[in-house]
C-alpha cells in the first residue's frame, strides 16, 4: 500500500465480474498459436499497428486477435497474418483465456491478463503508464517501456524471443498467477470496508 489512504497493487485491482469465474491458465504449451493485441480504448500511440507489423515481420503464422477500443481509429492495410480485428468485445476474459501470449499497454488490461496467467509484453502508451508498478517481470510481464520509443526491429525481436522461449513464458505465467492468487473483488471490497471502519 502507498500512504495511509490508498490500497494499491495488483491484489487491490477490481476487475469485471466475468474475470472472477474464469479458469486460470496453469500450463503453458511449447508453441504459441494465438497472440492477443490490445492497446486500450483509443491507442493514441498506434501501438497495435506497430505490434501487427512486428508479428508480420517475424513471420508469425498463428492466429492474431487485435482488439480495438471504441475510441480507437480503424487499422487499415493488408497484413500477412491470420488476423481478426475485434471491436466492442462483450466477454474479454473468454478471449484472453484463449491466448498464448499478449501485447498490451500498461493499464487495467495488464491486470486482467495477469489474473488469467497470460504471458504479456507491455508497451506503455505514455509517460503516466511508465509509473505503473504492476507491469513487471515479477508479475509476469516483459515491460519494454514507452512504446513510441521502441523500434520495430526491437519489438519484433522481443516478440520472437518470447515465442521461442517456452521456459520464460512458463515463468511469466507462474509469476502472474502468484501475483494475483489472493486477488478477488470480494476481498477488495472487504479490505475497503475494513479500511473505512465498517
Predicted regions and their residues:
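Acidic donor-binding loop of glycosyltransferase active sites
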Residues: 97-108
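C-terminal alpha-helical cap of glycosyltransferases
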Residues: 181-198
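Donor-nucleotide binding loops and adjacent catalytic segments primarily
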Residues: 29-99
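A nucleotide-sugar donor-handling region in carbohydrate enzymes
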Residues: 1-45, 69
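Short acidic active-site motifs
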Residues: 90-94, 109, 154
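Catalytic binding pocket for nucleotide-activated donors in carbohydrate/polymer assembly enzymes
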Residues: 110-157
Amino acid at each position: 500500500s502507498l500512504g495511509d489512504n490508498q490500497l494499491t497493487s495488483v491484489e487491490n485491482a477490481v476487475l469485471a465480474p466475468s474475470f472472477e469465474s474464469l479458469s486460470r491458465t496453469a500450463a503453458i504449451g511449447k508453441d504459441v498459436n494465438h497472440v492477443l493485441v490490445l492497446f486500450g480504448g483509443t491507442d493514441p500511440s498506434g501501438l497495435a499497428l506497430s505490434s501487427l507489423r512486428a508479428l508480420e515481420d517475424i513471420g508469425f503464422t498463428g492466429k492474431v486477435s487485435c482488439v480495438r477500443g471504441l475510441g480507437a481509429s480503424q487499422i487499415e492495410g493488408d497484413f500477412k497474418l491470420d488476423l481478426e480485428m475485434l471491436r466492442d468485445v462483450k466477454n474479454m476474459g473468454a478471449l484472453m483465456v484463449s491466448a498464448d501470449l499478449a501485447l498490451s499497454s500498461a493499464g487495467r488490461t495488464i491486470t486482467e491478463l495477469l489474473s488469467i496467467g497470460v504471458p504479456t509484453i507491455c508497451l506503455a502508451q505514455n509517460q503516466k503508464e511508465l509509473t505503473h508498478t504492476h507491469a513487471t517481470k515479477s508479475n509476469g510481464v516483459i515491460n519494454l517501456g514507452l512504446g513510441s520509443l521502441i523500434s520495430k526491429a526491437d519489438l519484433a525481436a522481443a516478440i520472437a524471443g518470447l515465442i521461442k522461449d517456452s521456459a520464460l513464458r512458463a515463468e511469466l505465467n507462474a509469476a502472474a498467477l502468484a501475483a494475483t492468487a489472493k486477488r478477488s473483488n470480494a476481498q477488495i471490497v472487504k479490505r475497503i470496508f475494513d479500511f473505512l471502519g465498517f
